[in-house]
Regions:
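Transmembrane helix boundary and interhelical loop/hinge segments in multi-pass membrane proteins
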Residues: 52, 56, 118-138, 142-144, ...
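Hydrophobic alpha-helical transmembrane segments of multi-pass membrane transport/permease proteins
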Residues: 70-91, 108-115, 232-244
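Secretory targeting signals
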Residues: 26-51, 84-124, 148-226, 252-255, ...
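Short, strongly hydrophobic alpha-helical membrane anchors
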Residues: 1-28
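Aromatic- and glycine-rich beta-strand/loop motifs that create alpha-glucan
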Residues: 53-72
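Short cytosolic juxtamembrane segments of multi-pass membrane proteins
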Residues: 231-232, 240, 317-322
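Helix-capping/transition residues at the boundaries of transmembrane alpha-helices
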Residues: 65, 126, 137-139, 220, ...
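Junction motif at the cytosolic side of a transmembrane helix
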Residues: 48-55, 222-226, 303-322
Length: 322
């Protein structure tokens, strides 16, 4: 039997495969290049802060302390188990199981990262202040502002590593299992490139999750400068719930008494609008999240975090550590 004929001296199957991956690369380059650039920019900024500033020594120590905490390993293990188990559980969504799985996976990553951030802020800031450890640190050539900034950066980069770990795991599960299982149930066939393009749809969600966690981390650090863990956890939970409901509060207050409208608009102004970081609707509608939307939310997160960190400086400036 003759071998398969060659086209231009190349195997046609190999040429088709190379063309397919070139199309995938162009798709990634056009839609997700901002993610790669933003991630490397963030990692470069963290590297500079960690190794070229006095704040970095506190940030590195905070990250090491957070990673060694049992709750970090527990949430990492529980989150991984949930992602793996949900991959095999049918959602009975009439062909949209992959969308439901992505939504549940991003929610799992968000909750796990938030719990780590709030818990670490309470331990690393509030208990160090109450246990007089902070006074020992501040007796060295480290200012109170560097202490707060170092704690925030350390907690934020801890959640970043957790989100990246979960993100890689979720992409692998969608690429290797979930997309193919969903297609098989619908009597369809998906190529590896199609499975990978489906898996990469979570990248905007991961970016939005980190922005939301960064905002909540700054709030938790600010509260920890004055209040103990229980109050911190309760307040952050309330801010998280109300922050996701602020658009609803504003809409429902229209036409009501002026006082109710004033309170709703005040809450919407002071508290972060966390619903902007929710991409459940985009997943359900199979809509693409544009890069400018991510950019606007990144700018909003940066401004809000900066304001809360400044508030933390004010709250901690006259705190008695003796």
């Amino acid at each position: 039997m003759n071998d398969m004929p060659k086209l231009g001296g190349a195997d046609p199957l190999q040429a088709i495969d190379e063309l397919t991956w070139e199309l995938l690369w162009s798709y990634v380059r056009d839609d997700y290049l901002w993610f790669v650039v933003g991630l490397f920019g963030l990692l470069a900024a963290l590297y500079f802060v960690n190794y070229f500033t006095r704040t970095g020594s506190i940030a590195r120590a905070t990250t090491k302390e957070a990673v060694r905490q049992p709750i970090f390993l527990l949430l990492l293990a529980m989150g991984s188990v949930m992602l793996i188990v949900n991959c095999y559980i049918p959602f009975f969504s009439l062909g949209d199981d992959t969308k439901m799985y992505i939504d549940c996976g991003l929610a799992t990553i968000l909750i796990s990262s938030l719990l780590v951030a709030i818990w670490t802020a309470s331990l690393s800031v509030a208990e160090e202040i109450e246990g007089k450890t902070a006074m020992t640190l501040l007796s060295k050539p480290i200012t109170r502002r560097e202490f707060i900034m170092g704690k925030y950066v350390g907690i934020a980069q801890t959640t970043l590593w957790m989100i990246l770990f979960f993100g890689v795991l979720l992409i692998c599960l969608i690429f290797l299992l979930k997309a193919k299982l969903d297609a098989k149930e619908s009597s369809l066939t998906m190529t590896s490139v199609e499975c990978l393009s489906t898996a990469l749809r979570i990248l905007p969600g991961l970016a939005l999750v980190f922005m939301e966690v960064a905002i909540m981390t700054s709030i938790s650090v600010a509260i920890s400068t004055r209040l103990p863990m229980l109050v911190n956890v309760t307040t952050c939970l309330a801010v998280f719930v109300i922050g996701h409901l602020t658009p609803v509060l504003v809409l429902t207050s229209l036409g009501n008494v002026p006082f109710v409208k004033f309170v709703a608009q005040l809450l919407a102004t002071i508290l972060p609008t966390l619903d902007n970081f929710n991409m459940s609707a985009a997943i359900a509608m199979d809509a693409k999240i544009p890069a400018d939307y991510i950019g606007y939310n990144a700018l909003y997160s940066l401004c809000y975090v900066s304001a809360i960190i400044l508030l933390s400086f004010i709250l901690f400036e006259d705190r008695d550590l003796a």
